[in-house]
Amino acid sequence: MPRKTPIERYRNIGISAHIDAGKTTTTERILFYTGVSHKIGEVHDGAATMDWMEQGQERGITITSAATTAFWKGMAGNYPEHRINIIDTPGHVDFTIEVERSMRVLDGACMVYDSVGGVQPQSETVWRQANKYKVPRIAFVNKMDRIGADFFRVQKQIGERLKGVAVPIQIPIGAEDHFQGVVDLVKMKAIVWDDESQGVKFTYEDIPANLVELAHEWREKMVEAAAEASEELLEKYLHDHESLTEDEIKAALRQRTIANEIVPMLCGSAFKNKGVQAMLDAVIDYLPSPVDVPAILGHDFADPEKPAERHPSDDEPFSSLAFKIMTDPFVGQLIFFRVYSGVVESGDTVLNATKDKKERLGRILQMHANERKEIKEVRAGDIAAAVGLKEATTGDTLCDPQKPIILEKMEFPEPVISQAVEPKTKADQEKMGLALNRLAQEDPSFRVQTDEESGQTIISGMGELHLEILVDRMKREFGVEATVGKPQVAYRETVRTTAADVEGKFVKQSGGRGQYGHAVITLEPNPGKGYEFLDEIKGGVIPREFIPAVDKGITETLKSGVLAGYPVVDVKVHLTFGSYHDVDSNENAFRMAGSMAFKEAMRKAKPVLLEPMMAVEVETPEDFMGNVMGDLSSRRGIVQGMEDIAGGGGKLVRAEVPLAEMFGYSTSLRSATQGRATYTMEFKHYAETPANVSEAVINAKVK
C-alpha cells in the first residue's frame, strides 16, 4: 500500500501552554477547520473533543495528551494536502511528565500564550523541556479579545523570561472588544475573518491607515531576522531592504525556526474563531517535517556502547518509541507510539528491544481525540495507537526483530510526594493492587510500593493534584474506593564531608564453611550527580569477581540512610583496599562488607537531611500582598521577586518554599485573600533541611 501523504508534508506538533491559555479551545478549532469535527466543542461547557477523561472535563483542564490526526490544505486552499498529527499536552504543573513525554516524540511545537497573562511559570517549564529536546516552535498569542490583551508585551516577555527570540510575522488589528483580525507582515495585507461562517471564510484587505506605520516597523524587524539566515540573503537585504521576495522570507524564517534560532509569533482568538487558520498555515510554513530534524539516535541492541541511528524513511528498518499508555474502556490497553523509520502492519511481530521480548502487533488505531479508526499499517513519521501489546511501557523501543535498535530512553522525574492508600473494604484489596499497577504503567512519574515496616501501600507522585486525580481514576475506572493518608514529603539523605578509609569487615567462622569479606572505602559528597562507585583496588587485594558485590551491597544500603531511613543521594564511593580468604570469601560476604563500610562511613561524613524545594508563584490583588508575603515567610519561604501583573491585575510573587510547608496551602491562601489569589508550584531542587526541622523529622520517623 503506497504512502498517502509524502513524509515531507507531515507535521508532528504539540500544542502546549499554561493552564487556561486556551490551548484545548485552540486544538478544537484546528479540528473544526481541518474538517474533522463538525460541532465545535467548547471547554467552557465541558464538551471538548480532546479532553476525553471525565476529570479533565469536570476540572476544565486537559489531563492526557491525546494524539489526533488532521489534514490541511492552507487557509486559502493554496497548499498540497498536509497531514498534521497533533499531540495535545496538559498545562498543569502536576502533569509536567505528560508534556515531557510528548516533547520527546514531537518535531515541532506551537506555544499558546494568554494575551493578558503572557509567559507564566508553566510556560517556562514547557519552554525548558522544548529546549532539552531541541524542539523548534512558533508562538500563538491567544485570547486577543480579552480586556488587557497586549501582543507586544508577550513578545517582550518571551525574550526576557524565556530568552527566546520572538519574531512577529503578524500584528493584531485592535485588541479587547475591538480585535478584528491580523496584519500578515509577509504579504503586508490585513486578514479579516468572517463571523457568519465561524471564521472559515476570510478576506485580504488593505492595512488600516492607523496601523500602516507600525506594520512597516515590525515587517522591517521580521525581514531583518530572515536575512540573517545566510550571507547571500544578508547582502541582498543590505543592498536593498525591499528586495527579498515572499518565498525567500518564508524559506529563511523556516530555516532559522528549525535551527531553533527564532520563534515566529502570531495572534488571534480561538474562542472568537480568529487567527487559528493562519496559525495552521504557519505550522506548515515554519515547523519541520520528520525529514527536517536530525535522525533519531540510539544504540546497538547487542552492544550498548555502539551508537546507532534511524533516518525518517520507509526503506529503513522499522523503529518506533512507545510514548504513552492508556487504558480504554472498550479495547483495553492502548500503546501510543511514534514511528521513526520503516513500515509495520497490524499482525506483524515486533521486538520490544528495551525488554528483549517479541510481541505480535494487534490492531493499529489512528486516534481523533476519543474516536478511533482502524488502519492496516503505519509508516515513518506516523503516530498511532496499538492494541494487544502486553509488555510495552512508556519509553520502550518497538522495532524490527531482524534489525534491532534501542532508541534513546526518556528521563522521568523522581516523585516528590507520597501518601498511604488503603481500600475501604477488604474485597477491594486485590482490585486496588491491579488498578494501581495499571495506573503506574501508564504514568512513569507515579510509583507504587509497599512499606516494609507497616505493610501499607504507598503511592508517590509529582504533587497533591496528581495523586488526587489518580485516586479519583481508581474509583471511576476500576470501581475501587480508597482512603488516603496525609501526604508525606520525599526527604533524602546525603553527606557534607569526606570520610576516608572506613572499613567494613564481615567474618563468620563457626564450623563448616565460613564467610569472609573485607572492604575499605572513602565516601565523599557528589552534589547533583547521584551515586558513583569507583573501583581503585590495586594488586588484586579484592579479587575482580567480588568488586560488583561490594557495589551491590552499597547500592542496597542507599535505599535507607542512617539518619531516618530515607534514600541516600549524591555520594561518591571509592573502593580503595580490602582483603579476602581463599576459601571463605564469596559474593554475599563482600556485599555485607560493602554495606557495613558504607553505613559506618556515612555516620562519619556529617549526614544531613534534604527536602524538596518548590518554586511557588502567587498572583494576588494588591490589598492582600502583606498577608501573602507574611504567610509565605511563616512557611520558611524565601521571596525571590515581585512584579506587577499586566493590566492592573495585582501582583505576582515568586518564592521558593519547602514542600513540607505547602500542604493545605490552597485553603489558607483562599481564606487570606477572600478567594481572590491563585498560585502554582512545581518542584525546583533538593536543599538541606534546617537543623530544627531536621531534628523533628528524624524524631517523628524514629518513633
From Swiss-Prot:
Its main location: cytoplasm. Keywords: Cytoplasm, Elongation factor, GTP-binding, Nucleotide-binding, Protein biosynthesis. InterPro entries: EFG_II, EFG_III, EFG_III/V, EFG_IV, EFG_V, EFG_V-like, EFTu-like_2, P-loop_NTPase. PROSITE patterns: G_TR_2 (PS51722). GO terms for biological process: ribosome disassembly. SUPFAM superfamilies: EF-G C-terminal domain-like, P-loop containing nucleoside triphosphate hydrolases, Ribosomal protein S5 domain 2-like, Translation proteins. Pfam families: EFG_C (PF00679), EFG_III (PF14492), EFG_IV (PF03764), GTP_EFTU (PF00009), GTP_EFTU_D2 (PF03144). GTP binds at residues 17-24, 88-92, 142-145. GO terms for cellular component: cytoplasm. Residues 8-291 form the tr-type G domain. It is found in: Cytoplasm. GO terms for molecular function: GTP binding; GTPase activity; guanosine tetraphosphate binding; translation elongation factor activity. NCBIfam families: EF-G, PRK12740.1-5, small_GTP. HAMAP family: EF_G_EF_2_B. Catalyzes the GTP-dependent ribosomal translocation step during translation elongation. During this step, the ribosome changes from the pre-translocational (PRE) to the post-translocational (POST) state as the newly formed A-site-bound peptidyl-tRNA and P-site-bound deacylated tRNA move to the P and E sites, respectively. Catalyzes the coordinated movement of the two tRNA molecules, the mRNA and conformational changes in the ribosome. Belongs to the TRAFAC class translation factor GTPase superfamily. Classic translation factor GTPase family. EF-G/EF-2 subfamily. PANTHER family: RIBOSOME-RELEASING FACTOR 2, MITOCHONDRIAL, TRANSLATION ELONGATION FACTOR G-RELATED. This is Elongation factor G 1. It comes from Burkholderia orbicola (strain AU 1054). The gene is fusA1.
